[in-house]
Amino acid sequence: MDRVIIIGGKGSAIVIAEQIYDAQIKVGNIEFLGFAFDDESFGKEINGFPILCKTYNAYEEYSKYNDVKFIFQLYRPDLIKERINLLNSYRIPINRFYTFIHPSCVVARSAKIGFGTAIMANCVINPNTIIGNCCTIHSNSLIGHDTELGDYNFFAAHSVVGSNNTFGEGNFVGLNTTFNNYITIGDYCFVGMASNVIRSIDSFKKVYGNPAKEFTKEIKPL
């Protein structure tokens, strides 16, 4: 049995914690230990799960336990690159990150999923899909066949990604967003909720709408 610590404590970190706990009850091959989180205003627990340590010393505290692995969930749409740099500063070996797939998901045998990626309830990952390390795919999302996602991509719930697409790294995709087939999304792009992306997007672009178009306003922190 693997035991999991989530680095983070707000938003998606809590969602993933609850889904790991759900899998723990239904399947029993995983145990959620608690959070590594720095905000002391939360006290000693979040939603009944303990805060075990700070983010920066999580690996130091638990590296001696070979069955303890980590999931990183400190992503923010306005600070994606900074948060990826923060993750890398912890110097946690990639094989100590846990790949979580909720038992309700359908994942093709030919799909390849990297370390530290979390795939939430009722997602479908179609054949020959490649998903990189430390990605997050929230509930009821679909990744089309022959699509490749780089590292650190975040998809909010109800995302639909068409087939034969390529995503770089560090992209943030809002709720209920749809992507056409045969398009390329660069690195560190932001796609606003309910967007319909019908064309490729260059790196570092912010888009939203139907069809999705570029915008320049600052992204509000979540």
Where are these regions (language model features)?
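A general structural motif
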Residues: 1, 32, 65-67, 94, ...
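A solvent-exposed beta-alpha-beta segment
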Residues: 1-71
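Generic structural signal for conserved hydrophobic packing positions in ordered secondary structure
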Residues: 8, 70, 97, 144-145, ...
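Glycine-rich hexapeptide-repeat left-handed beta-helix
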Residues: 9, 151, 156-222
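Cofactor-binding loop segments of dinucleotide-utilizing enzymes, especially the Rossmann-like FAD-
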Residues: 9, 37-38, 75, 102, ...
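Short amphipathic alpha-helical segments
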Residues: 17-19, 83-86, 131, 202-203, ...
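Phosphate-bearing ligand-interacting subdomains
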Residues: 42-101, 106
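Left-handed beta-helix
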Residues: 77-85, 89-147, 153, 159-165, ...
